[in-house]
């Protein structure tokens, strides 16, 4: 369940396609862990700040477990640039806190993961563990079919690969939504985990659903309950 909360924080290489603009949104989700008699909720939002930066927030809770995640982002020349990233998990297993600053001037990512210092060289296009989800959402909306992101994970940098599977209709509490199914690409010899996401074909490409299957067969799902994009309610048919 802890990994599920982490992931729910936890959400295509066609050079000719321009990535989508940023659209402020807010969404709430139901969260279920199939092998356990419990359910939870999650909220995700993107808002524009007075200084032109953007704030991406995520909150999730399931019984006694909770998780919050916040990224402050610059959007410059069609590129997402993290400024800061905070993460806090409590109530289940080991508590965890992360605070990172992305300094474009010094080309450094500095901060702490719990008590461990972080000092990583900031490469072009590098993202945090929340901002990459927004990049994925934008790239899917732009029509890209496969993509890779370099993501700071504590003192390390990992590569996240994704591919588009195709269009599907998803039944939600706001109706049937035309969505695009995406999955994370992993080396099957290294991990049997399955991660699948459905993004709305329209309506800003908002995340509609997520499915995660762990190596032990446990399955975690979130499903859109309601949401807005550019102040307009997300609607299905």
Stretches with model-predicted labels:
Residues 4-13:
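Sec-dependent N-terminal signal peptides
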């Amino acid at each position: 369940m802890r990994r599920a909360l982490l992931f729910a924080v936890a959400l295509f290489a066609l050079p000719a396609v321009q990535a989508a603009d940023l659209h402020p949104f807010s969404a709430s989700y139901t969260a279920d862990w199939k092998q356990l008699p419990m359910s939870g909720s999650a909220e995700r939002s993107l808002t524009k700040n007075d200084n032109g930066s953007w704030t991406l927030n995520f909150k999730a809770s399931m019984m006694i477990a909770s998780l919050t995640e916040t990224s402050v982002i610059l959007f410059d020349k069609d590129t997402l640039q993290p400024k800061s990233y905070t993460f806090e998990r409590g109530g289940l297993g080991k508590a965890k806190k992360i605070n990172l600053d992305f300094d474009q001037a010094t080309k450094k990512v500095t901060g702490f993961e719990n008590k461990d210092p972080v000092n990583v060289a900031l490469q072009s296009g590098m993202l945090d563990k929340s901002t990459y989800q927004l990049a994925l959402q934008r790239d899917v909306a732009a029509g890209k079919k496969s993509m890779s992101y370099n993501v700071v994970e504590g003192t390390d940098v990992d590569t996240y690969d994704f591919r588009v599977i195709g269009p599907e209709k998803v039944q939600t509490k706001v109706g049937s939504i035309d969505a695009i199914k995406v999955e994370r690409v992993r080396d099957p010899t290294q991990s049997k985990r399955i991660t699948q996401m459905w993004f709305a074909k329209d309506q800003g490409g908002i995340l509609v659903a997520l499915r995660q299957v762990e190596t032990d067969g446990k399955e975690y799902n979130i499903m859109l309950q309601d949401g807005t994009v550019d102040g307009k309610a997300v609607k299905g048919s």
